[in-house]
From Swiss-Prot:
Family: Belongs to the TRAFAC class translation factor GTPase superfamily. Classic translation factor GTPase family. LepA subfamily.
Record InterPro entries: EF-4, EFG_III/V, EFG_V-like, EFTu-like_2, LepA_C_sf, LepA_CTD, LepA_IV, P-loop_NTPase
SUPFAM superfamilies, per database record: EF-G C-terminal domain-like, P-loop containing nucleoside triphosphate hydrolases
Source species: Prosthecochloris aestuarii (strain DSM 271 / SK 413)
Protein name (database record): Elongation factor 4
Catalytic activity annotation: GTP + H2O = GDP + phosphate + H(+)
Annotated tr-type G domain residues: 9-191
Length: 604
């Protein structure tokens, strides 16, 4: 049934929002199966999670969209466009883009876990976008399910009536039909704006090696026809719509996309930067006056250097990053050089999970071996001459004498945990310079703790540590609140007096000594012994605050002296000592890749 002839009031655009592991992708699979979009023998777990990485980690990284046809109880045929969204804190911008393309949202909560931090964060995004929210309790068939307790949490959270909550088990296929009925009856149909000038919202784009950029969009106003000349608001470029259509499991070409529908557009976009996610598409000849609202250029929060292990692979790394950046509007990168690592790129990421995923995708999909430097945030530095600069690389931090003050980004964080672990979470937060704000009790067992943190303290391994101090129960979500002044210092690592720029970090003065000591000890275990002594020093400016020494490998030069005069032995030892001294002057210490990663897991 071609979507071109469909009545707008038979279309339902909705998405699924949930915390990680609450069964969102499995629920999407079940909906596809029940509506006949997928036959049972075509099923792979998590159909919409295309990347192996998504299936392996059990997370959704990209936004996906798929069209389903469903005959409701009233005998009418409906078109359901499901837009699957990521659930992790790093991808909240992807979530907001997908939400803007919908009219309704299924809020999925695990019956065994209850409401978690990410559930609340995504719920706020959905409420801001003005979506109709259908609460769904999933995994009701598990023995440990507490359906009534979780229902009460949802009622307290969004104020719905108990009978409005749909109970399902995505795995067992229970309650899916009643969920589809709820989508049809409760999610509003799109507004009928077919007569207005074309405005379409890009919520995702992927790169096809043969066709260029494939743009996924929601038609908000007007009609898009095959062969139309279209204009992108962000860069004012004009393209011809070579192919348009809707998305089933595969792309289904069509000749018309009307207001209210979701589809794709292929128009020979060669440069990946031209298809900006969040941009508005209009017709070149009958243009809309204003772009669609609510879109911002996404700002990276965490920065890290990516360098090829083999310097010959620099161009491969550049190409791979270019292709990745089309699929991922939030990846930012600029070339940089390092004395220790050669040529590479300074990359900006949304958060730590985003960084890990980009690294894994580079290694898996693009077969590039990379070394990563310590992740850090962007500091705002006021120099003594009154100039303000942004520093995203510790080695670019000016000398201490030239700095009048340093500001770092802060985030507001909410941590939901069992009441038993409040003490552990508080202790961890205080160690990380967190400022406690207040506590909300969700029920008798679970609390929502509010803190303000320097972003630098949580980009490292805070999430892992939080999970371990709460035995896996705590979940967190954060939002950026701005820059604040801090007493920060640049900590350099010197090997035999030579600074290694890739190991520099910016730390709070109160933690500098402890960090320097741990780092030197860690590097001592990783850097292999040389033919000469190697001094590892941590220094703030010219003041060394910690030192470890790797002793030299020594050949036994006295082995062939059987007995004999002591002065002969002394002469041989002195000669060896001179040789080592000369070596030390000309020798360069090879720093293995693990040393750059050591900084990431310094406590282990």
């Amino acid at each position: 049934m071609p979507s071109s002839s469909t009545d707008v009031d038979a279309i339902r655009n909705f998405c699924i929002i949930a915390h990680i592991d609450h069964g969102k992708s499995t629920l999407a699979d079940r909906l596809l199966e029940v509506t006949g979009t997928l036959q049972h023998n075509q099923m792979t777990a998590q159909v919409l999670d295309d990347m192996d990485l998504e299936r392996e980690r059990g997370i959704t990284i990209k936004s996906h969209a798929i069209q389903m046809h469903h005959k409701a109880g009233d005998g009418r045929a409906y078109i359901l466009n499901l837009i699957d969204t990521p659930g992790h804190v790093d991808f909240s911008y992807e979530v907001s883009r997908s939400l803007a393309a919908c009219e309704g949202a299924l809020l999925v909560v695990d019956a065994t876990q209850g409401v978690e931090a990410q559930t609340i964060a995504n719920l706020y995004l959905a409420v801001e976008a003005g979506l109709e929210i259908i609460p769904v309790i999933n995994k009701i068939d598990l023995p440990s399910a507490d359906v009534e307790g979780v229902a009460q949490q949802i009622i307290d959270l969004i104020g719905v009536d108990r009978e409005e909550i749909v109970e399902v088990s995505a795995k067992a296929g229970i309650g899916i039909d009643s969920l589809l009925d709820a989508v049809i009856s409760r999610v509003p149909a799109p507004a009928d704006h077919r007569s207005m000038p074309l405005r379409a919202l890009i919520f995702d784009s992927v790169f096809d090696a043969y066709r260029g950029a494939v743009v996924y969009l929601r038609i908000v106003d007007g009609v898009l026809r095959k062969g139309d000349r279209v204009r992108f608001f962000a860069n004012d470029k004009i393209f011809v719509a070579d192919e348009i259509g809707t998305m089933g499991l595969k792309r289904q070409p069509n000749t018309v996309l009307e207001a209210g529908n979701v589809g794709y557009l292929i128009c020979s976009i060669k440069d990946v930067k031209d298809a900006k996610v969040g941009d508005t598409v209009t017709l070149a000849d009958n243009s809309a006056k204003e772009r669609l609202s609510g879109y911002k250029d996404v700002k990276p929060m965490v920065f890290s250097g990516l360098y090829p292990v083999d310097s010959d692979e620099f161009e491969d790394l550049r190409e791979s990053l270019e292709k990745l950046s089309l699929n991922d509007a939030s990846l930012v990168y600029t070339p940089e050089t390092s004395a220790a690592l050669g040529f590479g790129f300074r990359c900006g990421f949304l958060g730590l999970l985003h960084m890990e995923i980009i690294q894994e995708r580079l290694e898996r999909e693009y077969k590039v071996n990379i070394i990563t430097t310590v992740p850090n945030v962007e500091y705002r530095v006021l120099r003594t001459n009154g100039e303000t600069i942004l520093v995203d690389n510790p080695s670019k931090m000016p000398e201490a004498g030239l700095i009048s003050e340093v500001e770092e980004p802060y985030v507001r964080i909410q941590i939901i945990t069992m009441a038993d672990y409040i003490g552990n979470v508080m202790k961890l937060s205080m160690e990380r310079r967190g400022e406690y704000k207040n506590t909300d009790y969700l029920d008798t067992l679970r609390v929502n703790l509010h803190f303000e943190f320097p972003l630098a303290e949580i980009v490292f391994d805070f999430h892992d540590k939080l999970k371990s101090v709460s035995k896996g129960y705590a979940s967190m979500d954060y939002e950026y609140i701005g820059y604040r002044r801090s007493d920060l210092v640049k900590l350099d690592v010197l090997l035999n007096g030579e600074p290694v720029d890739a190991l520099s970090t910016v730390v709070h003065r109160s933690k500098a000594y402890e960090w320097g000591r741990k780092l030197c000890q860690k590097l001592k275990t990783i850097i292999p012994k040389q033919m000469y002594e190697v001094a590892i020093q941590a220094a703030i400016g010219s003041r060394v605050i910690s030192r470890e020494t790797i002793s030299a490998i020594r050949k036994n030069v006295l082995a062939k002296c059987y007995g004999g005069d002591i002065s002969r032995k002394r002469k041989l030892l002195e000669k060896q000592k001179e040789g080592k001294k000369r070596m030390k002057q000309v020798g360069r210490v090879e720093v293995p890749q693990e040393a750059f990663l050591a900084v990431l897991n310094i406590d282990e």
